[in-house]
Swiss-Prot record:
Superkingdom field: Bacteria
Post-translational modification Phosphohistidine, affected residues: 212
Catalysed transformations (reactions): nicotinate + 5-phospho-alpha-D-ribose 1-diphosphate + ATP + H2O = nicotinate beta-D-ribonucleotide + ADP + phosphate + diphosphate
NCBIfam families: NAPRTase_put, PRK09243.1-5
Name the UniProt record assigns to this protein: Nicotinate phosphoribosyltransferase pncB1
Gene behind the chain: pncB1
GO annotation, biological process: NAD biosynthetic process; NAD biosynthetic process via the salvage pathway
Ligase recorded as keyword: yes
Function according to Swiss-Prot or TrEMBL: Involved in the Preiss-Handler pathway, which is a recycling route that permits the salvage of free nicotinamide (NM) and nicotinic acid (Na) involved in the NAD biosynthesis. Catalyzes the synthesis of beta-nicotinate D-ribonucleotide from nicotinate and 5-phospho-D-ribose 1-phosphate at the expense of ATP. It is not able to use nicotinamide. PncB1 contributes to basal NAD level.
Length: 448
């Protein structure tokens, strides 16, 4: 027995064109149906997004996904096809509600690119129970993914010590996740991505030249591999110019470097090494390039890099890094483990009291204290609208993002990149360490 008609994809239709409203969990809609039936659907509520803890050993996280959420909100609707599917398990009144659904509430939260810590009220969603509960899965799927990627990327940026990083993970994740990952990595400080969709959609600079296949394509049956490599390099330079990046480890790195300089001359832009003992090979390649007169040719390394291997290469003559699998999987922490919890009903605080999952009730805002030098010292979470009197330097973190369903915040990637960079500079001495440790600053919550 096949799927019901409403669930079948139309022939020829891309499989990524599901109505945005269906990018959710079924229980959001069954809760809505019950709330509409008993009259509680329109009660004013506040839901809060936060992480109870950072991934094991991490000292900070980076908020990402805000811009994508604000972009997704107007699209989060239920069209005729979606409603046909939902009518199989929802009553007519609920389907009618969904057919007309628009989020018309308010959202406050941390700006994209802001650092966060355990208990930080990253997002506060206000509106009727009906409209807020429908957003839960959308909010968490965006923030848990993008924040995990940005947090890992920021650690890699710190480990690189100012050397550029290129995101190259598209082939290691879902095609739509790849675009979001490229965006999140760029926010965290990566210089570019190999993903063209991220360039088109978000303006992320795209980099890329050739893979090993292009070199092997030029092999002649029974002929020397050196001749194949020379032919491939000549073809690439003729097409892209001497400033291109030539991949020199298809056969032998030493021979590859010699062939690269022979093809492009001393103006060769860069070589890339994708395998082997990268530090040793980079040193040998640098010496060889300098001997051949290619003193300005850069060395790019790639191949299963993460923040730890990047840090280990800081003393080597490496000019930039290409990072793939580790980046798009959050470098061991593929989710930020953020939650979306009801904290207020009719203006009255409510809270969950389950063991190990208790969370303070009430709508909250936050500010961050610092020393006169700019080094941050504490995250202070307080009841919304009741900030404490503080004489030390501090910065308000909770900002208006959406009003009456309409975005009101600056979601430019340039602003987010700047916020990440300044946030990393503000961490105390141990905050940038890669070794496992406690959060860089404590979070203190003033009860409602």
């Amino acid at each position: 027995m096949g799927p019901p008609p409403a669930a079948r994809r139309r022939e020829g239709e891309p499989d990524n064109q599901d109505p945005a409203g269906l990018l959710t969990d079924k229980y959001e809609l069954t809760m809505l149906a019950a709330a509409l039936r008993d009259g509680s659907a329109n009660r004013p509520t506040t839901f809060e997004v936060f992480a109870r803890r950072l991934p094991t050993g991490r000292r900070y996280g980076v908020v990402a996904g805000t811009g994508r959420l604000l972009e997704a909100l107007p699209q989060f609707r239920f069209d005729a096809d979606a409603c046909e599917l939902l009518a199989q398990f929802l009553d007519p009144a609920t389907v009618r509600y969904l057919r007309e659904f628009r989020f018309r509430g308010d959202i406050d939260g941390y700006a994209e690119g802001e650092l966060y810590f355990p208990g930080s009220p990253v997002l506060s969603v206000r509106g009727s129970f009906a409209e807020c509960v429908l957003l839960e899965t959308l909010v968490l799927s965006i923030f848990n993914h993008d924040t995990a990627i940005a947090s890992a990327a920021a650690r890699m940026v710190s480990a690189a010590g100012g050397r550029p990083l290129i995101e190259m993970g598209s082939r290691r994740t879902h095609e739509r996740a790849a675009v979001a990952a490229a965006r999140a990595a760029y926010i965290a400080g990566f210089a570019a991505s190999s993903n063209l969709a991220a360039q088109r959609r978000y303006g992320v600079p795209a980099h890329g030249t050739a893979a090993h296949a292009f070199t092997m394509l030029h092999a002649q049956h029974g002929g020397p591999t050196e001749l194949a490599e020379r032919a491939a390099f000549r073809a690439q330079v003729e097409a892209l110019g001497p400033g291109t990046t030539l991949l020199v480890d298809t056969y032998d790195v030493t021979t590859g470097v010699a062939n690269a300089v022979a093809a492009a001359g001393a103006e060769l832009g860069a070589i890339r090494i994708d395998s082997g003992e990268l530090g040793v090979l980079a040193r040998q390649a640098r010496e060889q390039l300098d001997r051949l007169g290619a003193t300005r040719t850069r060395i790019v390394v790639s191949g299963d890099l993460d923040e730890f291997s990047i840090a280990a290469l800081r003393g080597e003559p490496v000019d930039s890094y290409g990072v793939g699998t580790s980046l798009v999987t959050g470098s061991g922490a593929p989710t930020a483990n953020m939650v979306y919890k009801l904290v207020e009903v009719d203006g009255v605080p409510v809270q969950k009291r389950s063991s190990y999952k208790e969370s303070p009730g009430g709508r909250k805002e936050a500010l961050r204290r610092s020393r006169a030098t700019g080094t941050i010292t504490e995250e202070l979470v307080h009841p919304a609208g009741r900030p404490p009197v503080i004489v030390e330097p501090h910065r308000v973190l909770t900002l208006p993002l959406v009003r009456a369903g309409q975005p009101v915040a600056d979601t430019s990637l340039a602003a987010a990149r700047q916020l990440v960079a300044s946030g990393l500079r503000s961490l105390p001495g141990d905050g940038l360490k890669l070794a496992p440790g406690e959060p860089a600053i404590p979070t203190r919550t003033i009860p409602a």
